[in-house]
C-alpha cells in the first residue's frame, strides 16, 4: 500500500529494475560474443593445426621420396647401365662366335648330352665374367682413372687392328676353321684338362660337366674377350658389363651347342673378324673422345 500510495517511489523502483535488466542483458550478450569468439578462435587454431600437420606430412613424404630417389639414382645410372650392357653384349658376340670356347662347346655337344655341356660351359663363362668385371673395378682403385682409360683405349685399338689384320690374312677361312676344329678335337680326345683339380671335384660333379667347365675356363682365361671385359669394366657400369657379357656368352654358347660343328663351319671368320675389328676401333675412338667423368 505504501508503494501504491506513493507514486514517486513506484517510478523509482521501476527505473532501477529496468536499468538492472538492461545491464544484465548486455552482460549476457557480451558473454555470448566472447564465447563465440573463443570458439571461433579455437576452430581457427584447430584448422591451422590441421593444415600444419598436413604440411608436415606432405613434407615428410616429399623428403622420403627425395631420399629414395637419391638412393636409387635411376636417372643418373640407367643410361650408363644400358650403354655398358650393349657394349659388352656386342663385344662378346663378335669375339666368341667361332672362338676356341665356341668350338669346344660345339664338339662336346656332338658327343655328350647338350644340357650338361651347356651348363658346364656357361658356369665357367659366368665365373670368368664375374672375375673379369671385378678386376675391372679393382684396377681403377689402384691406378688413376685417366691412366686406366688410356690403357683401355690402347687395348681396344690393339684388338681392333689385330682382328682386321686377321681378316685381311684370312684367305681360306673354311680350311682354317676346319683345321682349328681338328686341333680342338685332338685336345679333347687326348684328355687334356684332366688335372688334380678335376679329380678333386669329380665326386661332386659329373665328369662331362666338369670337363666342359674346365676346358671352357682354361680356354677363356687370357682370351681377348676376357681382357676386353676387364677393359670395359674399368670405365663403364660394372653391372651392365656383367649382364651384357653373360647374355652374350649365353647366346653364343647356346648357338654352339644347338648348331654344333655345322654352324661353326658355315660362319665366315673373315666377316666376324672384320666386324669385331671395326667394333673395337669404335670402342677405342669412343673411349678417347668421350672419357668418363
UniProtKB/Swiss-Prot annotation:
Domain of life: Eukaryota
One GO molecular-function entry: metal ion transmembrane transporter activity
Residues that span the membrane, as ranges: 89-109, 115-135, 148-168, 200-220, 238-258, 272-292
Pfam family, one: GDT1
A cellular-component GO term for this protein: Golgi apparatus
Cell cycle recorded as keyword: no
Keyword field: Membrane, Signal, Transmembrane, Transmembrane helix
Location of this chain's protein in the cell: Membrane
Signal peptide bounds: 1-25
Family note: Belongs to the GDT1 family.
Protein name: GDT1-like protein 3
Amino acid at each position: 500500500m505504501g508503494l501504491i500510495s506513493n507514486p514517486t517511489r513506484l517510478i523509482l523502483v521501476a527505473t532501477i529494475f529496468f536499468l538492472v535488466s538492461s545491464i544484465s542483458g548486455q552482460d549476457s550478450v557480451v558473454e555470448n560474443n566472447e564465447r563465440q569468439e573463443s570458439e571461433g578462435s579455437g576452430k581457427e587454431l584447430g584448422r591451422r593445426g590441421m593444415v600444419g600437420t598436413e604440411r608436415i606430412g606432405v613434407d615428410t613424404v616429399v623428403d622420403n621420396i627425395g631420399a629414395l630417389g637419391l638412393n636409387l639414382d635411376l636417372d643418373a645410372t640407367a643410361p650408363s647401365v644400358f650403354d655398358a650392357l650393349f657394349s659388352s653384349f656386342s663385344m662378346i658376340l663378335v669375339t666368341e662366335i667361332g672362338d676356341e670356347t665356341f668350338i669346344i662347346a660345339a664338339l662336346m655337344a656332338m658327343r655328350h648330352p647338350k644340357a650338361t655341356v651347356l651348363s658346364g660351359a656357361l658356369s665357367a663363362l659366368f665365373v670368368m665374367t664375374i672375375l673379369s668385371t671385378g678386376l675391372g673395378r679393382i684396377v681403377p682403385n689402384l691406378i688413376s682413372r685417366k691412366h686406366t682409360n688410356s690403357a683401355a683405349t690402347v687395348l681396344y685399338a690393339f684388338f681392333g687392328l689385330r682382328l682386321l689384320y686377321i681378316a685381311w690374312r684370312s684367305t681360306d677361312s673354311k680350311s682354317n676353321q676346319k683345321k682349328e676344329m681338328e686341333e680342338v678335337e685332338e685336345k679333347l680326345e687326348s684328355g687334356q684338362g684332366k688335372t688334380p683339380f678335376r679329380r678333386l671335384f669329380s665326386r661332386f660333379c659329373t665328369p662331362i660337366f666338369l670337363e666342359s667347365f674346365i676346358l671352357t675356363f682354361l680356354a677363356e682365361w687370357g682370351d681377348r674377350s676376357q681382357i676386353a671385359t676387364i677393359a670395359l669394366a674399368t670405365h663403364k657400369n660394372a653391372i651392365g658389363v656383367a649382364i651384357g657379357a653373360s647374355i652374350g656368352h649365353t647366346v653364343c654358347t647356346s648357338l654352339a651347342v644347338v648348331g654344333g660343328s655345322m654352324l661353326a663351319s658355315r660362319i665366315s671368320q673373315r666377316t666376324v673378324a672384320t666386324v669385331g675389328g671395326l667394333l673395337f676401333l669404335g670402342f677405342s675412338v669412343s673411349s678417347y673422345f668421350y672419357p668418363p667423368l
